[in-house]
Amino acid sequence: MASAALIDADMAPTLQSILDQKTLRWIFVGGKGGVGKTTTSCSLAIQLAKHRKSVLLISTDPAHNLSDAFNQKFGKDARLVNGFDNLSAMEIDPNGSIQDLLASGAEEGQDPMAGLGGMGSMMQDLAFSIPGVDEAMSFAEVLKQVKSMSYEVIIFDTAPTGHTLRFLQFPTVMEKALSKVSQLSRQFGPMLNSFLGASGRLPNGQNMDELIEKMENLRETIGEVNGQFKDADLTTFVCVCIPEFLSLYETERMIQELNSYEIDTHSIVVNQLLFPKQDNPCEQCNARRKMQKKYLDQIEELYDEFNVVKMPLLVEEVRGKEKLEKFSEMLVKPFVPPQ
């Protein structure tokens, strides 16, 4: 009986299990565009701020909405949210310098490209010429947070699904690439050193051994992040959707991808649900509710081992601290529709 009660509690239609899991360090909130990811991530951050010493909310979506949600301007540096002393927010600038990513091994005050020898400017140009620079910038911020450990828990308000999946792949891709570069450096290092002469320095005065060491340090840090992302005690992903075919299809695709990356996900927030009263004369409302119920039934059938949170379509926009706080309460206390 105790185990059955535990299962029932675990699968409660709330995000309370995330608040109760004190080991969590990384929480991703993602889904298709326009389903309420930002509102959900802001609301979850507000709830977490009641339980944790320090919370950081990061927007990795190029179309930043955190400033709009809180009615407060945020930028690339973490800033306290008005009315909170332990909740900060920031919006990563996708057009910012890729140097942040390459600087993860540099000392404070040091030119981030210095450790990369003559390849610094070349790598920067290359980075901006390839797709996925948004993901690279987001990941650079993750590396910074891993090194600083300034916040107890970090929530990511992610970009639409495709960007998010590329971002979550980024650590594995980077780790493999840097591992290969390190291997080649060790293999051809002696030959290169013989060309460089007795000083063993690159044309701009940097030492080849220092370059290899910095790349190895970066690879180790990325490996650490990769390990944390795949640890269910440290990382989880909250899927946000609406009860429509395309959103449900995108959610299923995302969950399959997350499973293939070994990233934990056990929570789904279904937004914009209609709850018309029984004798409601509105034909459109009743027809839409009927359609929503069909997809909601599919969600509950497909994800019977998930915490499925049902959120109502509200009359007003959820903007500003007060409305977000009110919305956030429904993430931990199931919404009861009026009869």
Curated annotation (Swiss-Prot):
Q: Does the keyword Transit peptide apply?
A: no
Active site: residue positions = 61
Q: Where does ATP bind?
A: 32-39, 244, 271
Q: What is its EC number?
A: 3.6.-.-
The family database entries (Gene3D superfamilies) matched by this protein are listed as:
P-loop containing nucleotide triphosphate hydrolases (3.40.50.300)
Q: Which InterPro entries match?
A: Anion-transp_ATPase-like_dom, ATPase_ArsA/GET3, ATPase_ArsA/GET3_euk, P-loop_NTPase
From the Swiss-Prot or TrEMBL record, state where the protein is found. Cytoplasm; Endoplasmic reticulum
Give this protein's Gene Ontology molecular function annotations. Answer: ATP binding; ATP hydrolysis activity; guanyl-nucleotide exchange factor activity; identical protein binding; metal ion binding; protein folding chaperone; unfolded protein binding
> Any one cellular component term from GO for this entry?
GET complex
Keywords, A to Z, come to: ATP-binding, Cytoplasm, Endoplasmic reticulum, Hydrolase, Metal-binding, Nucleotide-binding, Transport, Zinc
Which residues of the sequence carry a binding annotation for Zn(2+)?
A: 282, 285
Q: Which GO terms describe its biological process?
A: cellular response to oxidative stress; pheromone-dependent signal transduction involved in conjugation with cellular fusion; post-translational protein targeting to endoplasmic reticulum membrane; response to heat; response to metal ion; retrograde vesicle-mediated transport, Golgi to endoplasmic reticulum; tail-anchored membrane protein insertion into ER membrane
Where does the source fall among the domains of life?
A: Eukaryota
**What quaternary arrangement does the UniProt entry report?**
Homodimer.
What's the family? Belongs to the arsA ATPase family.
Q: What does this protein do?
A: ATPase required for the post-translational delivery of tail-anchored (TA) proteins to the endoplasmic reticulum. Recognizes and selectively binds the transmembrane domain of TA proteins in the cytosol. This complex then targets to the endoplasmic reticulum by membrane-bound receptors, where the tail-anchored protein is released for insertion. This process is regulated by ATP binding and hydrolysis. ATP binding drives the homodimer towards the closed dimer state, facilitating recognition of newly synthesized TA membrane proteins. ATP hydrolysis is required for insertion.
This one is known as ATPase get3
Q: What is the lineage of its organism?
A: Eukaryota, Fungi, Dikarya, Ascomycota, Pezizomycotina
